[in-house]
Amino acid sequence: MEIVKTEIEGVVILEPRVFRDARGYFFESFSVREFEEKVAHTTFVQDNESCSSYGVIRGLHFQKPPFTQAKLVRVIKGAVLDVSVDLRKGSPTYGKHVAVELTEDNHRQLFIPHGFAHGFAVLSDEVLFQYKCDNYYAPQSEGGILWNDPDLQIDWRIPADKVVLSEKDTRHPLLKDYISEFE
């Protein structure tokens, strides 16, 4: 596994070694030993999976302290633009984002540490998306930032008339109206 740093400290891309032959391909998608050596010491306790169609944007979500979550995300089928926004108070990259294309062909994974809002846009007809979390889902601690906050300047790569959102994701505050609880 190769680790690729992004412009925001702590957010890293994992690129596995993929072995291909006439039968197809094989790669190790996760190893605790290698992850802890190269990325972070964390214990994932919950795996989630979602299936979405083209134009769906999920996010930008987070869980408030003390229920914060680090995530390791990947695409099984299809393609997404995966976005992480730094919400850590005092961070030199506060309010900045990383956007990475994750696809069934590139097999990339993205590690998002505590203190980030996370979301993704579906770029393919359909996507099967998986993520590991190091804390359990806690509905009482749900939070979010508005997906199209103009200050974030995220290019979701979906035409406005094709965007599909949940009702909840249309009601999140702008970053400037959010008081960060993340250190």
Region spans (language model):
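Non-catalytic, conserved peripheral segments adjacent to functional cores
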Residues: M1-D105, S124-E126, Y131-C133, A138-E183
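Short beta-strand His + acidic residue motifs that chelate non-heme Fe in jelly-roll/DSBH
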Residues: L110, H118-L123
